[in-house]
Amino acid sequence: MEYKKILFQLFPDLENIGDWADWEENNTSLSAKLYNSKYIIKSREVEIWDDKSCIYNNIIYPKTGENLPCFGMDLMGFFDKKVIIVFDFQHPVENYLFSHPDLPKAEGTFRFFEPGNHFSENVFVRKCTMDQVNDYLDDFAAYLQAYKEMLESKKPSGFAVHSTYGDFDKYMKRLDPVSGYLSSKFGKEKAESLVNDFLFCYG
């Protein structure tokens, strides 16, 4: 997947620190992995796929103390003609309107993605077909490069994860639309564990 390749090209020091899940049930596969690096507490990655759909989700949580946003990315392919791509700087402070001056501001409104409510003015949302997915690689690389420059400029070093990311994870847990889908594929117990213990464990 080209988006994932760009992530690891720009952050070559990301180290796999654990494979949290590797499931296969009801003709659906799920992989959940954790990475970290010098300035990143964790990059938590989930991939879900079956014969018709594929979902990639990753949120990068920087080390704390420098008022930095997280970086979130979603690639949700439900079938050939319905793909949703989202990436953004997701600030952990509620009602904090983050904006990067060198990147375009979002136009219009989007369900689930409200600028100022853990999403930035630059939130990038596109709906496309499977054939068009790679049309936005340059945009993704520009956003990710800007994020890398933030980290290298601020050099975060703290580990106050619950006080910094607790509200953010609680909000994302309420917002997250995949719990029902996960339950239908892997059962309620596994779905709740993934959401509470992996995806949003600080909340």
Language-model-detected regions and their locations in the chain:
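Alpha-helical oligomerization segments
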Residues: 146-149, 153-203
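Extended, non-transmembrane interaction/recognition domains
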Residues: 57-158, 162-163, 168-170
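Terminal low-complexity, poorly structured segments
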Residues: 3-6, 10, 99, 166, ...
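Non-membrane alpha-helical secondary structure
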Residues: 2, 6, 132-139, 170, ...
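Short Lys/Arg-enriched alpha/beta "domain-start" segment
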Residues: 1-71, 80
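Hydrophobic, Leu/Ile/Phe/Ala-enriched alpha-helical segments that form helix-helix packing faces
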Residues: 7-14, 18, 24, 140-154, ...
